[in-house]
């Protein structure tokens, strides 16, 4: 169980930190101790008791349409089957950069043995926080995580065409390339060997943009072209880790990586598919599609 730092709520830095958390969850802090509600998280430390109210169900209802009809009595474990990443008895919330993980146990006596713990009760027992984002006094910028995307190509597709796509259809990859993007900016390329290992090469300049301004008379909004990107892999990586791969390390791809290509439309994830060979080129066979009709 990780120890959770207790800090003064009057500190300006703590107030800022609380506001940042509120952007992801509806969180309020109190100095009074509340019990008996699944949505109340009790933080106990040697410095005193804190209660953080996490309106989990409201967040899920707003974020995921599948939960719109759920009642407040539904257990977190039930909800986790659709949203939370399951690993044994641990559940992660993928929306947080510093992930919060839960551990479920029916041994309630654990709630009183430790001086630093974080838990809340559910119909299945006590749920503990194994890990929680903590306030840092200092941050090394080289240790911040950045999203790296191993892009394999893109296509320009009419919006109306995307609306007609169904599972099992194939989107032709119009432009094949092996570009490496960091925070959606091209920083280099990569070469994959026969062992499914990628050698990362950083470029000294990003070159000219392929986008040009085009005058277009719009008679139908569905005639607007959107850019569809096919992402072979996404990886959060620090600058230090990136330097390691650039200098002497090879990045190992999963063996079945071509079966799990992410499909993004104007930067937003809309589906997944498999890289397939077609006549005179390649395409992505859709395995899941999240575009509303």
UniProtKB/Swiss-Prot annotation:
Under the heading Pfam families, the entry gives: FliMN_C
Family membership: Belongs to the FliN/MopA/SpaO family.
| Coiled coil stretches, renumbered | none
Keyword set includes Glycosyltransferase: no
Q: Which InterPro entries match?
A: FliN-like_C (IPR001543), SpoA-like_sf (IPR036429), T3SS_OMP_SpaO (IPR003283)
Protein name, per record: Surface presentation of antigens protein SpaO
Q: Which GO terms describe its biological process?
A: protein secretion
Task: Note the effect listed for residue 13 to I.
Answer: In plasmid pCP301
Protein task: Required for surface presentation of invasion plasmid antigens. Could play a role in preserving the translocation competence of the Ipa antigens. Required for invasion and for secretion of the three Ipa proteins.
Per the UniProt entry, the effect of residue 143 to S is: In plasmid pMYSH6000 and plasmid pCP301
Keywords in UniProt for this one?
Plasmid, Virulence
């Amino acid at each position: 169980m990780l120890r959770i730092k207790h800090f003064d709520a009057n500190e300006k830095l703590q107030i800022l930190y609380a506001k940042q958390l509120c952007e992801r969850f509806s969180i309020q802090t109190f100095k009074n101790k509340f019990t008996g509600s699944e949505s109340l998280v009790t933080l106990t430390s040697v410095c005193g008791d804190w209660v953080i109210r996490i309106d989990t169900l409201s967040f899920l209802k707003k974020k995921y349409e599948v939960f719109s009809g759920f009642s407040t009595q539904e257990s977190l474990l039930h909800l986790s089957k659709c949203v939370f990443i399951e690993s044994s008895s641990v559940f992660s919330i993928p929306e947080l950069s510093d992930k919060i993980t839960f551990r479920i146990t029916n041994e309630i006596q654990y709630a009183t043995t430790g001086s630093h713990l974080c838990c809340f009760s559910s119909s299945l027992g006590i749920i503990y926080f194994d890990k929680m984002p903590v306030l840092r006094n200092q941050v090394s910028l080289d240790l911040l995580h950045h999203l790296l995307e191993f892009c394999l190509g893109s296509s320009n597709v009419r919006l109306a065409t995307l609306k007609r796509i169904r599972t099992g259809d194939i989107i032709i990859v119009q432009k094949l390339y092996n570009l490496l993007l960091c925070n959606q900016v091209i920083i280099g390329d990569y070469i994959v060997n026969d062992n499914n290992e990628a050698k990362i090469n950083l470029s000294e300049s990003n070159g000219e943009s392929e986008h040009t301004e085009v005058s277009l008379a719009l008679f139908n909004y569905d005639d607007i072209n959107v850019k569809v990107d096919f992402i072979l892999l996404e990886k959060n990586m620090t600058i230090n880790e990136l330097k390691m791969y650039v200098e002497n390390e090879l990045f190992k791809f999963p063996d079945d990586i071509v079966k799990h290509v992410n499909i993004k439309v104007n930067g937003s994830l809309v589906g997944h598919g498999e890289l397939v060979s077609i006549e005179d080129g390649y395409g992505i066979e859709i395995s899941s599609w999240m575009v509303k009709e």
